[in-house]
């Protein structure tokens, strides 16, 4: 595809390991016959964006335009696109491509494809780098575009494309979505608060598990959790032993697993979706004597992401956000590093991100 066919774009990019974002002009590919192009209206800020901007995992190629919680309105579709039209409300999440032929792709688990292409900071099949949603427009293959229900506000829907499917996918896959089940949610941050909302929509009993008593009212009164446990209170934890069918652990800080395993019923599942930087100690005896499982999960496939968003539309589920302007992004990143956000930053891209003269 020649340069003459590419379209100019602008956004915010990190250009070195300081992680500081600054204006950046670049080119996006022309709209291919199976591509969808859309104007970006809002983009959520995920902790992964911060880690990648600072090259904390040693994987970053600069310049990096972050953003994988992207929503907007379709402006152009390719000749062979069948599912979308100009004016549709759409989004793109954590991935923008995969091989589409491996076992994972054939099973609808594109998120586990060995050749999965991340929406931001990854090498595409044509050897160009992908640039994320901190930008004025996106172009993506039709098969990786998500339709956003008309009744959902786009700013609050944006984080669902990462945070939402990250908690929804393991609930569905591990059968923790049955009405009447008892589900624990560890941590009440960007992932945890959305997990509570989806678990309640599925008809389960939800207990939030936190180190902080201060979050009790927020969890129970505002988010609708059925119960709240302070994990540092031995009596509370003891009284709840053996009561939960599954636990979604959203915490990325190092923390003990033994107390959480104690909360599970026999055959219960502890699902890790947070990613602590240091290894966690895993006690084996509770697993052996209760046939309990500790498993991991990462975002979700395209089909289940669409199912998640559709369920959100049915139950009016959105993330609780702080809407920010593009010129506040670096401050937001500093606050995010200190966990100073309730619960997700979202950039008002369309109204505040303008190209430099």
Swiss-Prot record:
Binding of NADP(+), residues: 48, 166, 187-192, 210-215, 250, 274, 297-299
Q: Which GO terms describe its molecular function?
A: cinnamyl-alcohol dehydrogenase activity; zinc ion binding
Q: Which residues are Zn(2+) 2-binding?
A: 99, 102, 105, 113
Q: Name one GO cellular component term.
A: plasma membrane
Q: What does the note under cofactor report?
A: Binds 2 Zn(2+) ions per subunit.
Q: State which pathway it belongs to.
A: Aromatic compound metabolism; phenylpropanoid biosynthesis
Catalytic activity, per the record? (E)-cinnamyl alcohol + NADP(+) = (E)-cinnamaldehyde + NADPH + H(+)
Q: Which SUPFAM superfamilies match?
A: GroES-like, NAD(P)-binding Rossmann-fold domains
GO BP, one example?
Answer: green leaf volatile biosynthetic process
Q: Which cofactor does it need?
A: Zn(2+)
Tell me the protein family, please: Belongs to the zinc-containing alcohol dehydrogenase family.
Role of this protein: Involved in lignin biosynthesis. Catalyzes the final step specific for the production of lignin monomers. Catalyzes the NADPH-dependent reduction of coniferaldehyde, 5-hydroxyconiferaldehyde, sinapaldehyde, 4-coumaraldehyde and caffeyl aldehyde to their respective alcohols.
Oligomer and partners: Homodimer.
UniProt protein name: Cinnamyl alcohol dehydrogenase 7
Species this chain originates from: Arabidopsis thaliana (Mouse-ear cress)
Gene (UniProt)? CAD7
């Amino acid at each position: 595809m020649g340069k003459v066919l590419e379209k100019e774009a602008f956004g915010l990019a990190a250009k070195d390991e300081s992680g500081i974002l600054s204006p950046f002009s670049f080119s996006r590919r022309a709209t291919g016959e199976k591509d969808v192009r859309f104007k970006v209206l809002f983009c959520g800020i995920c902790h992964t964006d911060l880690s990648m901007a600072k090259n904390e995992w040693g994987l970053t190629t600069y310049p990096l335009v972050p953003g994988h919680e992207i929503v907007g309105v379709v402006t152009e579709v390719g000749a062979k696109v069948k599912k979308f039209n100009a004016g549709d409300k759409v989004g793109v999440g954590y991935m923008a491509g995969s091989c589409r032929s491996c076992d994972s792709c054939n099973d609808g688990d594109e998120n586990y494809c060995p050749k999965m292409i991340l929406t931001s900071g990854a090498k595409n099949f044509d050897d160009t780098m992908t640039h994320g949603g901190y930008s004025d427009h996106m172009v993506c293959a039709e098969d990786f575009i998500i339709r956003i229900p008309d009744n959902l506000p786009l700013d609050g829907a944006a984080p669902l494309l990462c945070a939402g499917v990250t908690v929804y996918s393991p609930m569905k896959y591990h059968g923790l979505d049955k009405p009447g089940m008892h589900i624990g949610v560890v941590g009440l941050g960007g992932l945890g608060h959305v997990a509570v909302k989806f678990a309640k929509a599925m008809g389960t009993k939800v207990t939030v598990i936190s180190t902080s008593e201060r979050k009790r009212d927020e969890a129970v009164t505002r988010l609708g959790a059925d119960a709240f446990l302070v994990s540092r209170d031995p009596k509370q934890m003891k009284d709840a032993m053996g009561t939960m069918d599954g636990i979604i652990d959203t915490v990325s800080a190092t923390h003990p697993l033994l107390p959480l395993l104690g909360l599970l019923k026999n055959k219960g599942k502890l699902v890790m979706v947070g990613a602590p930087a240091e290894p966690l100690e895993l006690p084996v005896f509770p697993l052996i004597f209760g046939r309990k499982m500790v498993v991991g999960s990462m975002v979700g496939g395209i089909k289940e992401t669409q199912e998640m968003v559709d369920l959100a539309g049915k139950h009016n589920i959105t993330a609780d956000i702080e809407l920010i302007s593009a010129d506040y992004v670096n401050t937001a990143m500093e606050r995010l590093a200190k966990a100073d956000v309730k619960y997700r930053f979202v950039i008002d891209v369309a109204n505040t991100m303008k190209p430099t003269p």
